[in-house]
Amino acid sequence: MFRKRQTIIISKAGNTLEEMCHDILKQAGGEGLLKIAFFRNAANDSEYLQVLGTLRSTVESFFVTERPLVSYIAQKPGGSTLAAEALYLDDTVANIERHSRYTLLTRGECKEIITEGIVPTDISISAFEQSTEIFSTIGDILQKNGFQPSDIYRQ
């Protein structure tokens, strides 16, 4: 296992989604930041995808290098319009291998994969089809990095 910590961050400034996201990213900083999971209400699937796209593009433009993974949970945060849970790596001897939608941490024989929120390519398909696609994506990531599906310990 690797030493990690989580922090909850609440947007305190901004009127637009981009401004609130920037405020959270400034508060989060960049040192050791592996993943940021945003919380914001969404009225429907279309709004969910729009918000996710905005959050991803804002994070990509904010972090030129070592971009953290991005997840979005469609849930109204208490006391704010946008909140986030930031995951930091405090383990200075870990090797970090960043990929487009996941990060691989290694140190000797120890390996850990951290993923973004994995979203199906089409959220209008049935829940069965969505879950099949998502688990296939997860399986591909695990296989590519020498893991077994039974190695998953937190979803």
Give residue spans per PLM region:
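Short, polar/acidic, helix-capping and beta-turn segments at strand->helix junctions
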Residues: M1-Q155
